[in-house]
């Protein structure tokens, strides 16, 4: 399995994301550049220039018309996907940690960090109302007083958002009223990543407590646990197999004191039902910060602390592989 290597960032990758069809791959890093690539051959299509700090999150809407990015320069920006033109600039008081379009692409949400004396907020904007964008006034703002949000996604049908916190808590906030619908605490440490399944019925969380866990999207009922010996930075569900891929590794500050072999910087594949590991893919030098499955399930990508993104197309053996219970 020879990967395609994407070199478009000078700093550590923070998030990678495919669009719905999977023909484009968006990558953001701890530099101000937002890149978009053809996923089939790794050719760089273009960049979205404008941010002045590390970019923490990226999302594309349903029909890949708009791209949304959130950055440590205290702004969330909306871009025209095709032309790279900046359509909106939403200023915040602290860094934007997570962002996302709802199912219809009309409503955006983003969460800000708890820093510099400012509270962590989740803001909701309706793109159909230009006055909200012009006046930088969201139609709803949810304060998070206890522990800041470290990852968030829209729930099924855009009725709620699912948010993971620094404390390991998982919340479901209503997108209509802003109230907390469900609250669970299955992780003991920070939740680094949340990714939904293709049909949005379940999602996987990746946590600093060395586990990834599977939950039901509507009830937040905990279903499966995937254990490793290292903090898990990202986890993604296969769209057509019962497989989950985990990416992680040591904290950046511990990395220099160990060899890469001890660091365990592989992408690890687990069976969804049996919670058993069945494969690993080496390659990155340093921890893996973000993983994503292609929507057709025939390839996956990973972005690492080394600043590289690798696109892996699965070998035929992967598709013939039968897991023996």
UniProtKB/Swiss-Prot annotation:
It comes from the Eukaryota. WD repeats lie at residues 1-39, 43-81, 87-127, 135-175, 180-217, 221-267, 275-316. SMART domains: WD40 (SM00320). Coiled coil: none annotated. GO terms for biological process: cytoplasmic translational initiation; formation of cytoplasmic translation initiation complex; translational initiation. The modification Phosphothreonine is found at residue 219. There is a cross-link at residue 282 (Glycyl lysine isopeptide (Lys-Gly) (interchain with G-Cter in ubiquitin)). Phosphorylated by TGF-beta type II receptor. One of its GO terms (cellular component) is extracellular exosome. The modification N6-acetyllysine is found at residue 264. It is found in: Cytoplasm. InterPro entries: eIF3i, WD40/YVTN_repeat-like_dom_sf, WD40_repeat_CS, WD40_repeat_dom_sf, WD40_rpt. PROSITE patterns: WD_REPEATS_1, WD_REPEATS_2, WD_REPEATS_REGION. It holds the Pfam family EIF3I. One of its GO terms (molecular function) is RNA binding. Belongs to the eIF-3 subunit I family. Component of the eukaryotic translation initiation factor 3 (eIF-3) complex, which is composed of 13 subunits: EIF3A, EIF3B, EIF3C, EIF3D, EIF3E, EIF3F, EIF3G, EIF3H, EIF3I, EIF3J, EIF3K, EIF3L and EIF3M. The eIF-3 complex appears to include 3 stable modules: module A is composed of EIF3A, EIF3B, EIF3G and EIF3I; module B is composed of EIF3F, EIF3H, and EIF3M; and module C is composed of EIF3C, EIF3D, EIF3E, EIF3K and EIF3L. EIF3C of module C binds EIF3B of module A and EIF3H of module B, thereby linking the three modules. EIF3J is a labile subunit that binds to the eIF-3 complex via EIF3B. Component of the eukaryotic translation initiation factor 3 (eIF-3) complex, which is required for several steps in the initiation of protein synthesis. The eIF-3 complex associates with the 40S ribosome and facilitates the recruitment of eIF-1, eIF-1A, eIF-2:GTP:methionyl-tRNAi and eIF-5 to form the 43S pre-initiation complex (43S PIC). The eIF-3 complex stimulates mRNA recruitment to the 43S PIC and scanning of the mRNA for AUG recognition. This is Eukaryotic translation initiation factor 3 subunit I. It comes from Homo sapiens.
